[in-house]
Amino acid sequence: MNNTEFHELVDEKLQLLEDMIDDSGADIEPVITGNVLTLEFENRSQIVINKQEPMHEIWLASKSGGFHFSYVDEKWTCSKTGMEFIEMVKEECQKHADEEIEWV
């Protein structure tokens, strides 16, 4: 994939994530600065998601540590856990929010 395709794929996934957060009603504030999406929680904890263009990866940093996602078989998969990106973000959001989140 070239850089343009990479950015299109990541932007599409991040927009989906923002929409899911909005639809959930959870107290999570998404803040975008350049290639970084920070999810800010009421308890002041954060999840940081950024695009790593040179490696064509999405990186996620949370309470659980750092994770790298590569685009394989038309989905973003974690190199450490094998989890799909959105599923891992949902799991990490639950940990940071300290409450059950109703994902739509």
UniProtKB/Swiss-Prot annotation:
The gene is cyaY. NCBIfam families: FeS_CyaY. HAMAP family: CyaY. This is Iron-sulfur cluster assembly protein CyaY. GO terms for molecular function: ferric iron binding; ferrous iron binding. Keywords: Iron, Metal-binding. Involved in iron-sulfur (Fe-S) cluster assembly. May act as a regulator of Fe-S biogenesis. The lineage of its organism: Bacteria, Pseudomonadati, Pseudomonadota, Gammaproteobacteria, Vibrionales. GO terms for biological process: iron-sulfur cluster assembly. CDD domains: Frataxin (cd00503). It comes from the Bacteria. Belongs to the frataxin family. It holds the Pfam family Frataxin_Cyay. GO terms for cellular component: cytosol.
